[in-house]
């Protein structure tokens, strides 16, 4: 099996990626970065792939007749609600989009990667998979869950040349961050980070682009935090 992976790498590495949530923010930066490296990137929109509807995921996979070497599970939702008042609908919808839909995509694409002897999976997690915050119980639980799913992928598909990891960003300057915070609030967030600023989406994307490349030949089953030192304090 190792010979198959080396042969694929020497041929130029991965050639096609599927990136969810690629319309903006980290997902768009990842997709753009991969395309700049000559990789064909599939960027399904919600009309094509609605992660909140299991049947939509199944239909998308059925219609996908292209080889996918790279899967970046970036799309997710976060609807803050305190534990005591957390609704069943909020909990269920968060787990569906952030966990179950990703599991379905993995179940559909991993056998194809295994058959090719090469695959790279990265799920975008969060520092809140590792640190609790008021109102984030559904979101934090979903991110912790997807990290465990990815570790299982690493164990079960490692023998077939598939490496799977999570990247857990801290505060990132995405469109949503700007929409939800004024200048004073952004400064307050930056002061909580040892490096004194929030990350740019491109800083997350450049690491993911390396992690899914053939240059990464051994890192798997990990959750790598990119937070400017936030979790250290």
Give the residues covered by each predicted segment.
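Short, small/polar-rich loop/turn modules that mediate ligand/substrate recognition or access, typified
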Residues: 158, 163, 219-221
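N-terminal Rossmann NAD(P)H-binding glycine-rich loop of SDR-like oxidoreductase domains
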Residues: 23, 31
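C-terminal substrate-recognition "lid" of short-chain dehydrogenase/reductases
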Residues: 118, 197-226, 231
């Amino acid at each position: 099996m190792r010979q198959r992976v080396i042969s694929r790498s020497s041929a130029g590495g991965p050639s096609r990626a599927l990136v969810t949530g690629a319309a903006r923010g980290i997902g768009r930066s990842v997709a753009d970065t991969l395309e700049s490296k000559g990789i064909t990137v599939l960027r399904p929109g919600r009309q094509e792939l609605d992660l909140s509807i299991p049947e939509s995921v199944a239909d998308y996979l059925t219609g996908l007749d292209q080889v996918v070497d790279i899967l970046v599970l970036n799309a997710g939702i976060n609807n803050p609600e305190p534990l005591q008042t957390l609704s069943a609908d909020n909990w269920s919808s968060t787990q569906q989009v952030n966990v179950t839909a990703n599991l379905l995509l993995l179940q559909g694409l991993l056998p194809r990667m295994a058959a090719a002897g090469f695959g790279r999976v990265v799920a975008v997690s969060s520092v809140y998979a590792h640190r609790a915050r008021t109102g984030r119980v559904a979101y934090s639980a979903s991110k912790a869950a997807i990290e465990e799913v990815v570790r299982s992928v690493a164990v079960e598909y490692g023998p077939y040349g598939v490496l799977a990891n999570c990247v857990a960003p801290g505060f990132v300057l995405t469109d949503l961050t700007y929409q939800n915070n004024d200048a004073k609030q952004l400064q307050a967030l930056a002061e909580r980070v040892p490096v004194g600023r929030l990350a740019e989406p491109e800083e997350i994307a450049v690491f993911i682009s390396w992690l899914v490349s053939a240059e990464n030949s051994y890192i798997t089953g990990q959750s790598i935090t990119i937070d400017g030192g936030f979790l250290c304090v």
